[in-house]
Every structure is written in C-alpha cells, then in structure tokens.
C-alpha cells in the first residue's frame, strides 16, 4: 500500500523521485531531516545525495532516464478527489426516456477539439525528444489512432534526430519525425483524432513547422509556451559524448560543455555519465503571436493550437487574451503536478499552480471573454489526469449552462505507463517469467491477457498482426477502461451526451474546493429545490 505524503515539509529530505530516503520515518515536519542526524549513516537522503552529486540531485533518478516518467510528490491540498459526481434518477437527457434504450453503452463520449472529432475526450502527449517517448512511440501512436484520439509529437524531435538534414539552418528531412507521423497514420481512419506537431523556440528556428506542414502534410501545429512540470525549457539527458557535441553545434544549450577537454576527460573517467540538453524559453508578445498564427495558416496549418503551463494568474489572462485575438483553435493549460520525462523535482513539487486551482482561474478568464462577446478557443486541461472520474469533473466544472469550455483533457504519463507496462509484460511472457498470480488470473500469452485482442482481431483481420501489443494496451486503456468508465458515469448522472454535463452535476467535499471553484458542498446543493418540492 502506498504511503500518503504528509501535508507539511516532512517529505523534503527523502523523495522516491530522486531515489532518496531518510534513516527514520518520523522526520521533522519543518525540514524533513531526521530529528537526530548522525555521522555513521549509510542512508542517502536529499542532503546527502546533493553533497555528492550536486545538480544531478535536482532531477528524477538519472539512471532511469528514458525508461520512466516522473510527477510531483507534493500534496497540493486540492485535487479532483475533493469533488463527487451527482447521481440522477428522474430523467434521461440526450436520449429517449426508455429503460431499454437509456443504458450506459448508448452514451456518446464523442466531442470535438478545435474542430477535430475524437471518440473519447482525451488527447495524449506531448511526447517529444525524451528517450521514453522515442522508445515507446509505436505503441503511443498506433494506440491513439485505434482509439480515435489526438496524439501530439512533442518538442525538439528534429533537433535531436542524428539523421536529420538541414539547409541554411532549416530542417529539410527528419527520419524520426517522419517515422512518428507515419506510424500514427498507419491505423488512422482519417476521421477521428489526428497527429499534431508541437514546436518550441528551437523548433521554430529550425523550421520544423514548415517541414511538418509541407513535407509530412501534418494538419495541426502546436506552439508551446510551457508545461506544468517546469517553467523552463525542455530537458533531456545525453549519454554519448559525440551526440552531446552534435547538439551543441546545432544550437542547443548542453551542460556541462561537451567541447571542454576537462569535461570530456571527466566523462570518460565516469565522474558523470550524462550531459543535460536544455531548450530556450520563449518570451511571447501579443502582436508577434497573432502574426505567427496567421503565418502558420498561410503555410497550410488547418488547425493551430497552443500549449502553456501553470503560470501566474495574470499570465493566464494574457494567454487567454492572445489566444482569443489570434483565433487559436484550441488552448491547453497544464497544471502543476503533471508529468515529465525530465524536469527538476523541486520545480515539479514547489512551483506553479496546481490543476484544479488553474482550471478555476482559466474558467474565470473564459467567462469574462464570453461576456464581452470575444472568441474563446476550445480549452483542454492537463496535469495529473489518469481516470474517467477526473475527466468528468474537469469537463463538468467548465459548463456554466451553454456547454463546456473544457472539451477534453490531455494525458501524458498514464499513456506511457500503459505502453511501457505492455512492453514489459510482453517480454516477460516471451521469457516465461510472468508473475504467477498474473498468469493465473489473466493467462500467460498476450492473446489472453489483453482483453481487447479479440475485438481488434475481428475489426482488423490480417492487419491485426501489424498492431503492436503496446498499441493494443493503449487502446484498451483509453477505450475499454476510460471510455466505458466515462459512459457509466454519464449514465449514472442520467446524461447520455458529454456536452450535457455541467457544474450542477458536481459537489465539493471540502471548504477549500467550494471556495476555489464556487461549487457548493453536498448539504448546500439544491436547497431551493428541496423547499420547492416539499411545499
């Protein structure tokens, strides 16, 4: 059973994200240190690790880079568990009031994001140049295509591609980006979902947007202003000296300097085992952004989206203003607590606005824009989403009566978990090393333990052999779990169409939730209705 993080500073000196622990469990609630810190202690706490490895201690365990994702450990005091969903009884909205018809399989979870239809209100990504995205891309792309979802290729893919070709500083070919687009389209039905290419400052300098639009015929370009896990540029680890030098020559910030002879010697001697590659941070301006969006559309972008992080409220308002002026199709806000391939752990825990707080601020801005008759782009929330209850709550909270502002959620870590777990268990099955309890419950071959396999075999016939088990896993997670789970919640709420759920379908379970969102506590809900009904 997992241990819940204390709502004080007791967790500061021992975090699973950095692989650190303390000698005793009853640590100081002020500092996280052991009440008695002794000399003869072999345990590696945060202070200890920092004294040996310095900046490495800022990040999730370096040895796990490429084979893991990370998220915040801190309890922010308000999350989606602070709300419950109202159950209905006397009506059936969005469907015929017939008990033979109003059953949960008939619920529609379809929606549109920026004009793009999707089967479930989920986008996956953004999966950029970090190794965990590259290594798991086949399952991520094909699984999203099978699910009718949108998948987003993240930042720096072309810049990190050793086989990329450039002319006058602009990319003219990228084997890796082409691979990513082609894998999605292999099983894309051409109707539901799509693939987007995200671009940051480095990507724009390299002309990744033009290449993706003109050569790969991508329909969606996403500009990136930030993410919830960090408020600085994208980061990856590079374990090869020659590659680190290549990236520096391509204009990236590489730390330490791979061309420094002293650094090279230390690397060869094993003093450190990886370099850090960092991206620059953009400083957006309203006029430049509006012109940029117009330029992208002239280049052939059918849909333009913007992803930003969990910046201060005034920055949220300014972002909403610019997105409105530029008529951006969809705008993503990524709350603190979300996932990463590599972000500073202290920044994940201690910086930026947590998701529920952030959505409340975003919705305030959306209401102001709408009241003024201004354009409001479709909104997507991100930051720690893993199941259908959170999705329901995020969408319902955004509907003040004229339809939800939030059309879908963006999920990053959980799709990777689904794909990684499938890859690992496929390997264990091939080696005959599956855990006995798992094999006894679900079977010893992928054909048996992936419950959606028969359905996909029936649908795709001979082509099923081309679907990796990792793709089957993501489809199962997004469609058979989240999709069906969402249908059940909607039916229990007595609404058979996603756009019908609203704020009245939620209740706050804590004073802070009620104060932040304006959603009342259970005993305060529908008080007037009670009086009226019993009159």
In which residue ranges do the predicted regions lie?
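Generic secondary-structure signature for well-ordered alpha-helical cores
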Residues: 39, 145, 149, 294, ...
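Flexible, glycine/charged-enriched surface loops at secondary-structure junctions
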Residues: 154, 303-307, 372-374, 493-503
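Glycine-rich phosphate/ribose-binding loops and adjacent secondary-structure elements
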Residues: 267-458
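Conserved, mostly hydrophobic/aromatic
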Residues: 124, 144, 331, 394, ...
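A structural-propensity feature for long, helix-poor, extended segments
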Residues: 109-110, 163-194, 198-202, 428-466
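Active-site-facing alpha/beta catalytic cores
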Residues: 126, 131-323
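Conserved, well-structured core domains of diverse proteins
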Residues: 1-120, 132-136, 142-145, 150, ...
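Short histidine
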Residues: 415-535
